[in-house]
């Protein structure tokens, strides 16, 4: 992938391959043409489709399938998926971090071949992520049923003004110090208290529905995990084989009523950051994961009598290929940083600027001069009001966490402000199709 502007090229519909709905060709035009009124986000921007074709709406659908009272947001506008899910005894949702729709389709006939039996009997639909297109925001939406504006987890690094700290929202430690993970909790802050809305596990427990979450051992007790998985039975795993073996053991055990199981796997995302999302290593990791899913979960369950499972495979965002460029290091731009109260927050590809009074015009002019046409500048209050971060009433912390202005990256652009080497070959957070459009694959195993 080149460093120029990324263009979305729809992959031809695989009508011969899919025996039941492949909704890609009908839904993609809706996603690429959708616009949030009053917001100009750039020519390559995919606007989040919060009205019925986004991860926010998937959260509402899952709650409805499990019999929970309706939440504040619309479910997915996918009647075929509702029919597939109707009456399912168990719902298993697996999120494979950083898998864009385009890469999924490219890999389906190669490393994704183990999925073939699943797609022959299932449903494929493209959805948009939320804004920003990042794990902390998307997972929190899926586990609360609320938009990023409502739940307030608006990026990877956020200014938590109430604690006087820029925090890493995965580790809940200072963003500037990797060796202080969990500092907020050690200081007495309960991770769940950072969410102003209830989580799915708590709502399921109140309804008497069994809930499980399978998280890699290295992040099972992270701040973000502790924020999300209250009232949920938490399981660790060491590899994809371990994950799918454990999930099959759970699914083969008859539930007392309905059951919800969630799995999160970060291997594709981690390797994409280091080696680039188009590297052979990432393709191999994807193949390793889906082969384990097919061999240790899908095929054995299809041979098991009396099991009724709805399996969803989805992603939170994709990635774009980037190359480290010294000109993007803010330490080399004192004429910009002196106009900021503190370093940017949010994402390297969707940055929140905390401006000194009266410096907005000069900061914007500097950015336009140094990186022409690479960023779109948005007033943070305007973006929040217009619904870029989702519908609903924003939580009281949202405005301060977004700062004064937002920089939306185009093409492969980004900013780098961390006090460590810039080595990443894959990034996300912005609004390109590669970051925003993700696959949802569903199959009923019975």
Protein language model annotation of sequence segments:
Residues 75-88, 249-253, 298-306:
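A short acidic-Thr-Gly-centered motif at the start of a beta-strand
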Residues 117-139, 337-357, 420:
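A short, conserved beta-to-alpha structural element at the edge of catalytic cores
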Residues 268-309:
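A long, amphipathic alpha-helix that forms part
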Residues 93-96:
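Short hydrophobic beta-strand that contains or immediately precedes a catalytic carboxylate
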Residues 17-75, 108-124, 128-259, 264-274:
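His/Asp/Glu-rich, glycine-adjacent segments
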Residues 304-355:
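A beta-strand-loop signature enriched in Asp, Gly, Thr, and Trp
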Residues 340-446:
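Active-site neighborhoods of enzymes that stabilize oxyanions during catalysis
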